[in-house]
A protein has these predicted regions:
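Active-site/acyl-donor-binding loops of N-acyltransferases
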Residues: 2-13, 75-79, 147, 151-183, ...
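A conserved beta-strand-loop-helix scaffold within acyl/acetyltransferase catalytic domains
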Residues: 6-91, 143-290
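Acyl-donor binding region in acyl/amide transferases
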Residues: 78-161, 274-333
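Glycine-rich loops and low-complexity Gly/Arg-rich segments
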Residues: 95-99, 164-169, 194-197, 231-234, ...
Length: 369
């Protein structure tokens, strides 16, 4: 069953219609999504996720004239990724005291609704906030909005507060690894980058490129060994329930480092999508590898893979701020807009503390770069 609304937002705007659906399967076919995190396959993967405790799932189909959009919303009671952000920020108590409605998933590196007009965004917020109230959540959180879209969301509906949860990292690939390294802030960083790759080669590391069922065979290793390089903690952010269906997202590929005996040393779970190679998460077998620079070796191999597959952008994802700053990657602030379901100054205060703490966390990392 679906519920449709039709409203005319201004004398000069087109009518926007929207309908709720419990699954993406019943929705009309979509145009090619802007990122892998906006695909139907990504949304479908969250239909059975348990690592993030999702209590209900709601997919909003929006029609604006001939343009169609979909935005997925998730009622979450416990998110390991959100708790990791609280840990990084050093806050002393949980931000939320009840369920939250995220739109879309917090785990997608980029959120928002790329390509949508302001009336469509306004409809998404209005329907999302009404749903958030109806199901008893504290807030609607529109997650991980890149700078190019932030103004549009704020113009559509001013949020009660905003939080930059993390920064993505992007770099132009160029025609070769040498061209990529030439853009590093210092020559010494380039020498170290090459040296660490040679050390991995000398130790017998080889690259395995895994897709589909071959990648699915390694999801348990990504679930248990996922890391955020440079962090003093590594909460269990990912589970096989999450990772296995993500192998079916367009462009999903594992860049795996293997020892000479064929055993797993580490890997990047990636998406080669559009013009970019997205490095979504990393897994490193730290217990066996000691001081072997697996992460840097994989980063070098990722650049090679991006060059070989014609990617123009390397999107190195979130976290690992000091390391990525040393490589001269462009940081991109990802803002999450929070719309409260009722006035709650204490929640706004806690969100402000989270924002400040995360900003300080990133600045400390950059100062170490």
């Amino acid at each position: 069953m679906s519920v449709t609304t039709l409203r005319r937002l201004s004398p000069h705007s087109s009518a926007v219609t929207s309908t709720w659906h419990s699954s993406v399967v019943a929705l009309p076919a979509e145009r090619r999504a802007a990122t892998p995190f906006h695909t139907r396959e990504w949304a479908a993967a969250w239909q059975a996720v348990r690592t993030e405790q999702v209590r209900s799932r709601h997919h909003l189909f929006l029609q604006d004239g001939s343009s169609q959009h979909r935005m997925s919303f998730y009622q979450v009671s416990n998110s390991p990724l959100w708790h990791a952000m609280e840990d990084d920020a050093g806050v002393t108590r949980p931000t939320f005291e009840a369920d939250v409605l995220y739109g879309p998933s917090l785990y997608g590196e980029y959120g928002g609704l790329p390509g949508a007009t302001v009336p469509v965004l306004a409809e998404a917020v209005d329907r999302g906030r009404a749903l958030a109230r109806d199901i008893g959540t504290e807030a609607l959180v529109i997650t991980n909005i890149p700078p190019v879209e932030r103004t549009l969301w704020c113009q559509a509906r001013t949020p009660d507060t905003e939080v930059v949860l993390y920064w993505a990292h992007r770099a132009r690939v160029g025609a070769s690894v040498d061209e990529f390294i030439a853009n590093f802030p210092s020559a010494s960083t380039g020498r170290e980058f090459r040296s660490q790759h040679r050390r991995g080669n000398d130790a017998g590391l080889t690259l395995k490129i895994a897709r589909g069922s071959e990648l699915q065979a390694h999801v348990a290793e990504f679930g248990t060994q996922s890391v955020r390089v440079g962090d003093g903690h590594s909460p269990a952010l990912y589970g096989t329930d999450m990772l296995a269906p993500l192998t079916r997202v367009p462009g999903a590929v594992g860049l795996l480092a293997e020892h000479s005996d064929g055993s797993f040393a580490g890997g990047f779970f990636c998406f080669r999508y559009g013009s970019a190679l997205y490095l979504w998460t990393a897994a490193i077998d730290g217990a066996r590898n000691g001081d072997l620079p697996i992460y840097s070796w994989l980063m070098y191999e990722s650049v090679k893979f991006a060059v070989d597959t014609g990617a123009s952008v390397l999107d190195a994802g979130r976290f690992d701020y000091a390391y990525k700053a040393r490589l001269g990657m462009l940081p991109v602030a990802l803002m999450s807009a929070v719309y409260l379901t009722r006035p709650n100054p204490h929640l706004v205060s806690r969100l402000g503390a989270l924002h400040t703490g995360l900003n300080q966390h990133v600045l400390r990392a950059w100062n170490k770069a």
